[in-house]
UniProtKB/Swiss-Prot annotation:
Matching InterPro entries: Ribosomal_eL34, Ribosomal_eL34_C_sf, Ribosomal_eL34_CS, Ribosomal_L34e_arc-type
Segments forming a coiled coil: none
Encoding gene, per UniProt annotation: RpL34
Keyword terms, alphabetized: Ribonucleoprotein, Ribosomal protein
Species classification: Eukaryota, Metazoa, Ecdysozoa, Arthropoda, Hexapoda
PANTHER family: 60S RIBOSOMAL PROTEIN L34
GO cellular component: ribonucleoprotein complex; ribosome
GO biological process: translation
Protein name: Large ribosomal subunit protein eL34
Organism: Ochlerotatus triseriatus (Eastern treehole mosquito)
Amino acid sequence: MVQRLTLRRRLSYNTKSNKRRVVRTPGGRLVYLYVKKQRTVPKCGQCKEKLSGIKPSRPSERPRMCRRLKTVTRTFGGVLCHRCLRERIIRAFLIDEQKVVKVLKAQQLGKPVSKPPKIAKAPAAAAAAKPAKTATKSK
């Protein structure tokens, strides 16, 4: 005759978070072992590729993990993969170079470089000179 198994938790439905398997204990009894969800590796924020050098874990485990298991020592380590980071650095460099070239061309032509106009703030003395309004009730 097969041994009957009793649930260790109250939830009896076979949901994603309530998976069970039957295990034989050293004493010869059969009991339910609750299986945890599979751990995942974080993905790159841009290309959605798995990030290498980072330990797979559940989101609830990550706060208890030390930093070296969660990131790699690089700019945007643990957020972007190396290819996307390289692309981003090169793009930023080229944009900066374009700005420098624009300034140099303007200097060669003898034109001053146009800068966005600054917004002047109203003087504080003019604001203080205005009389304060008094609230009067009229019946």
